[in-house]
């Protein structure tokens, strides 16, 4: 993509309305634009990140055996009345009437609807297990939306729902999805800790929150130092991982640690995922019954698995930034490479830039080629801000010898590379 043809409305000044780093950087880098309190338009750069995260989440859900569906944003209120949850959400749930005076709502979650889908289509234990997921926009009318997309009113979520014949099988599915979440966050390039949690209004028997470690996190997490090995050793047994200590500050008790205090560390964390073993709460209330192996009707056992896709964008930035801007993990970066031509009127610079652009594009590496008239200092500031993992810098002096500079955005290290060999260094 040529920057001269791209829509990248960067801001030079810090927006006064932004309170946290991710909100400031998303506005400054032209990722989003606020349309109302807690409601944002996703501009091209931000949408690319959102799609990259969505694709990684979907890939890991598919690997775990979940099947993708797409439920509507708008839900009939009678399903929530049937499940007994209609009044639980209070004013956070946006309710309205259609022209026929039917009460509808903008779904804040989907347990009720997925239970309705299940009960009308699956009747026998022979059709189990089933695991369905969707990625859809949701709305919660937060009384005080803040922190940009971290706590907006409209947000993108991945929700999965599993159905099993009994508790034993339901826990097996839960463990499979627990491992899928570990893999998902590893693939996203972030360090996430699973913490035992309360089920809240969702209900149920077993629950874990996943917190990305970031200095600006809202919660303090105390956890076993062995969690740091997950990035390099993803095949650790789920039961072993679940046995490691991890607790949020309100549940951490130094007098009840199962291991020595020296084996524990603490960090700030941002919650980005929550999984629940619900049990039969919804299936009993909504009569989602199946014929078991003995020919008797039994309520299906359910679990729910959520990941905040749009919230993840902000959380990843909070964990990967510096005073200059964003530092994207390679897997989610909107562009893997910023190609910076310092003199677009120098024929050799143009030649090398064209070659680098073609070579990288031919390998399906996404490149943002800065072919603008901006001054070098302005170009460096822009590309440091938007956070491409690699920067290729082409100036007249080194270009004369077929040399370009390759800068690693995270470390700041710069290497001189022959343009012919450039492709071998991008990964």
From Swiss-Prot:
PROSITE patterns: AA_TRNA_LIGASE_II. It is an enzyme of class 6 (ligase). It is found in: Cytoplasm. Pfam families: HGTP_anticodon, tRNA-synt_2b. GO terms for biological process: prolyl-tRNA aminoacylation. The keyword ATP-binding applies. The keyword rRNA processing does not apply. It comes from the Bacteria. Its main location: cytoplasm. Its EC number is 6.1.1.15. It catalyses: tRNA(Pro) + L-proline + ATP = L-prolyl-tRNA(Pro) + AMP + diphosphate. Keywords: Aminoacyl-tRNA synthetase, ATP-binding, Cytoplasm, Ligase, Nucleotide-binding, Protein biosynthesis. GO terms for molecular function: ATP binding; proline-tRNA ligase activity. One of its GO terms (cellular component) is cytosol. PANTHER family: MITOCHONDRIAL RIBOSOME PROTEIN L39/PROLYL-TRNA LIGASE FAMILY MEMBER, PROLINE--TRNA LIGASE. Catalyzes the attachment of proline to tRNA(Pro) in a two-step reaction: proline is first activated by ATP to form Pro-AMP and then transferred to the acceptor end of tRNA(Pro). Homodimer. Belongs to the class-II aminoacyl-tRNA synthetase family. ProS type 2 subfamily. NCBIfam families: PRK12325.1 (NF008979), proS_fam_II (TIGR00409). This is Proline--tRNA ligase. It comes from Rickettsia akari (strain Hartford). The gene is proS.
